[in-house]
């Protein structure tokens, strides 16, 4: 793990932990229903200011909080076209299996690669620090996986080019 990744992940961890102070909040419109206010957005007084934790211009997190839910969006570093393709395909693969991840959204927030939605029910059923650990570990693993796939792809391209050029 790089030296700049650790402080970034620590900042994300502390901010996300503070944002997960969620409680039950019934809908003001429909009786006996509770909807994630960060998704619905009908009551602006219930929404908190969105926070952006940034490592650099290409890599950042958006944390949108409300009384009963938190939407956590990640923009993954994409320096070149290969990384853009790898990230897009990898995120499509994960979002296609969103029902396996209880907190993963099928569609990310505009401008971000992947989003999570954590409601007060998730924090009641699961431990808050385990949710935060999962997201931080997810960020570490995705960063490592994309780097590994890019190295493998470059090595494979080099091998194919050498094989092709050896014919001449």
UniProtKB/Swiss-Prot annotation:
Subcellular location: Cytoplasm, Cytoskeleton, Actin patch
Domain of life assignment: Eukaryota
Keyword Signal tagged: no
Keywords: Actin-binding, Cytoplasm, Cytoskeleton
GO molecular function, one term: actin filament binding
Any single GO BP term: actin cortical patch assembly
Signal peptide annotation: none
GO cellular component: actin cortical patch; Arp2/3 protein complex; cytosol; nucleus
Family: Belongs to the ARPC4 family.
Subunit structure: Component of the Arp2/3 complex composed of arp2, act2, arc1/p41-ARC, arc2/p34-ARC, arc3/p21-ARC, arc4/p20-ARC and arc5/p16-ARC.
Function according to Swiss-Prot or TrEMBL: Functions as actin-binding component of the Arp2/3 complex which is involved in regulation of actin polymerization and together with an activating nucleation-promoting factor (NPF) mediates the formation of branched actin networks. Seems to contact the mother actin filament.
Protein name: Actin-related protein 2/3 complex subunit 4
Organism: Schizosaccharomyces pombe (strain 972 / ATCC 24843) (Fission yeast)
């Amino acid at each position: 793990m790089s030296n700049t990744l650790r402080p970034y992940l620590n900042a994300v961890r502390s901010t996300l932990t503070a944002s997960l102070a969620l409680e039950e909040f019934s809908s003001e419109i429909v009786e006996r229903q509770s909807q994630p206010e960060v998704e619905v957005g009908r009551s602006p007084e219930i929404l908190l200011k969105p926070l952006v934790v940034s490592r650099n211009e290409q890599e950042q997190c958006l944390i949108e909080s409300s009384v009963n839910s938190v939407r956590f969006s990640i923009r993954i570093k994409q320096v070149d076209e290969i990384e853009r393709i790898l990230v897009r395909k990898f995120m499509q693969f994960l979002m296609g299996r969103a029902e396996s991840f209880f907190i993963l959204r099928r569609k990310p927030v505009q401008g971000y690669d992947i989003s999570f939605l954590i409601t007060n029910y998730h924090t009641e059923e699961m431990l808050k620090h385990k949710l935060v650990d999962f997201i931080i570990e997810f960020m570490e693993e995705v960063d490592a996986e994309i780097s590994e796939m890019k190295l493998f792809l470059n090595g494979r391209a080099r091998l194919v080019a050498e094989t092709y050029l050896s014919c001449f």
